[in-house]
Regions:
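Active-site loop/helix belt of alpha/beta enzymes
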Residues: 1-119
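C-terminal accessory subdomain/extension
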Residues: 116-236
Length: 236
């Protein structure tokens, strides 16, 4: 990946020489990272073979690891002494594996306010959305200041009352607007799921990422520290 590390036997020797001059520093392991574990296996194998060749001179007993989530699933030959499970711990299937993963994270907020707009009324900054009919609009207490990506403006949907509701207008710093005309039972205080399951419906990290033009890793890392975090075990 050309980020950090060594690329040749000579560089390995330089590192070992430097370590020999620092007796307080003990070499305990070596690792690599696949550039495209979800892509061309031939290139991944080439990376792996290079890693094994360069680490061959290292002291016996060190820990070698190469495989993160996708590689640990696709490439059994790359598991070595340990694996680095990351996104798979969140239940996201980076590659099609047949493993029945369950999403471990949701992102939720509440309906703060509901109003009815006449046809032709515009909403939000820049007036980017115009009501095509009389429309019930819910204001939700979340925005890009909370980590709900602004790039999802006008494309994302949320779950209210077990139904998908489109985000309308631009995502604001602290609020978003949602069309709840087709959810007549929606009311202030209702839970709105931005990412996660509600009833029989689910918005996955990959789906939210597609709306925002990014990847699932980013949407799962986006919630701001000001967003309360609740941890559940066995539903409690």
């Amino acid at each position: 990946m050309s980020r950090i590390g060594v690329r040749s036997e000579e560089e390995v020797r330089q590192v070992l020489d430097a370590l020999n001059e620092c007796p307080a520093v003990k070499l305990t392991g070596a690792f690599m990272h696949f550039a495209a574990a979800d892509g061309d296996e031939a290139f991944a194998r080439k990376q792996f073979d290079t890693f094994m060749r360069l680490t061959a001179p290292l002291p016996a007993g060190i820990v070698r690891h190469a495989a993160a989530s996708d590689a640990s699933i696709r490439f059994p030959w790359a598991r070595l002494d340990m694996v680095r499970e990351g996104i798979s711990l969140y239940g996201c299937p980076g590659v099609q594996s047949g493993i029945p993963l369950r999403y471990a994270m949701s992102f939720e907020t509440r309906v703060e306010f509901i109003k009815t707009l006449p046809a032709g009324e515009t909403v939000g900054y820049g007036r980017t959305w115009t009501a095509p009919r009389e429309t019930r609009v819910a204001t939700l207490g979340v925005g890009y200041g909370d980590g709900y990506l602004r790039s999802a403006s006008g494309k994302a949907q949320v779950l209210i009352g077990g139904q998908l509701c489109p985000v309308i207008g631009r995502v604001c710093m602290d609020q978003i607007l949602v069309d709840v005309t087709d959810v007549p039972g929606a009311q202030e205080g209702d839970c709105a799921v931005l990412m996660g399951r509600q009833g029989e419906m689910e918005i996955t990290p990959d789906q939210l990422a597609a709306w925002a033009g990014t990847i699932s890793y980013e949407v799962m890392l986006s919630p701001h520290p000001r967003v309360p975090v609740l941890y559940y075990e066995e539903g409690k």
